[in-house]
Swiss-Prot record:
Keywords from the named record: Isomerase, tRNA processing
Enzyme class: isomerase
NCBIfam families: hisT_truA
Biological role: Formation of pseudouridine at positions 38, 39 and 40 in the anticodon stem and loop of transfer RNAs.
Subunit details: Homodimer.
Residue positions binding substrate: Y111
Superkingdom, natural source: Bacteria
The keyword Isomerase is assigned to this record: yes
This protein's name: tRNA pseudouridine synthase A
Active site per the UniProt annotation: D52
Biological process according to GO: tRNA pseudouridine synthesis
EC identifiers of the protein: 5.4.99.12
Length: 260
């Protein structure tokens, strides 16, 4: 068998998430069906992150195993042909050794969340950002975000249906940045960790948005973290501003990343 790493970009709006489901459209299901068009199946692919319904990806990483020795460029071209018209694209493909695993070899996952601050309805960016009508206090949001960095029990910031064995995670980065775009002022959250709890990033952003709006304070966030109580979390923000932006490996599979 030959193993191939795939870099995958997608708009998550039409899907109930990454993970295959029998009766609902998923990204994993679409890619496995495309593989079935070019090679005998069944096929099961693995991914670095199992994104939820409505969540997008700039650079999800997956791998597949095929009996035939494919040229990576031809494999990506064939998959992209059979994925149409779904909003999924294979943007890079490379052969990897059998020990390399898209999920278990990953050292860090990096997420981007976009908030668009403007009163007029979003048009071009609709479904790609979380739009809020008021200005947000970025300084206060940064102060609150800094309190979440490091190793903590994140019970407050995980879904009640989270299946992780432990709520303890190490958050490597939670940067809050203002960005001027042609569509208006955006606030970008750069969130990085080896792994995340279910709904953790969206819980962070929803809580920090309330700080930016003046409804709560950085001290409230510190208390919520210490309480280890889901009821102390702010509102979970919608999924459509969230992107899996990058996955870090000790041995980056894609040529362009090996010098980073």
């Amino acid at each position: 068998m030959h193993r191939y790493a795939l870099k995958v970009e997608y708009n998550g709006a039409p899907f109930v998430g990454w993970q295959r489901q029998k009766e609902h459209p998923t990204i994993q299901g679409a890619i496995e069906r495309a593989l079935g068009k070019i090679a005998p199946g069944p096929h099961t692919i693995a991914a670095a992150g199992r994104t939820d319904a409505g969540v997008h990806a700039i650079a999800q990483v997956a791998h597949c195993d095929l009996e035939r020795d494919w040229d990576p460029f031809r494999l990506s071209e064939a998959l992209n042909y059979h994925l149409k018209p779904a909003p999924i694209a294979i943007t890079a493909c490379t052969a990897v050794d059998a020990e390399w695993h898209a999920r278990f070899s990953a050292r860090q996952r990096q997420y981007l969340f976009r908030i668009l601050c403007r009163r007029a309805p979003a048009t071009h960016q609709k479904g790609l950002v979380w739009q809020v009508k008021q200005k947000l206090d970025v300084t206060a949001m940064r102060e609150a975000a800094a309190l979440l960095i490091g190793q903590h029990d994140f019970t407050t910031f995980r879904s009640t249906i989270c299946q992780a064995e432990s709520p303890v995670k190490t958050l490597d980065r939670l940067d809050v940045n203002e960005v001027d775009t042609p569509y208006g002022r955006e606030i970008h959250f750069d969130v990085r960790a080896r792994s995340f709890l279910h709904n953790q990033v969206r819980s962070f952003v929803g809580t920090l948005e309330r700080v930016g709006a003046g409804s709560s304070t950085p001290q409230d966030v510190a208390r919520a973290l210490a309480l280890r109580d889901r009821a102390a979390c702010g509102p979970v923000c919608p999924p459509h501003g969230l992107y899996l932006a990058h996955v870090v490996y000790d041995r980056p599979p894609f040529e362009a990343e090996r010098s980073i």
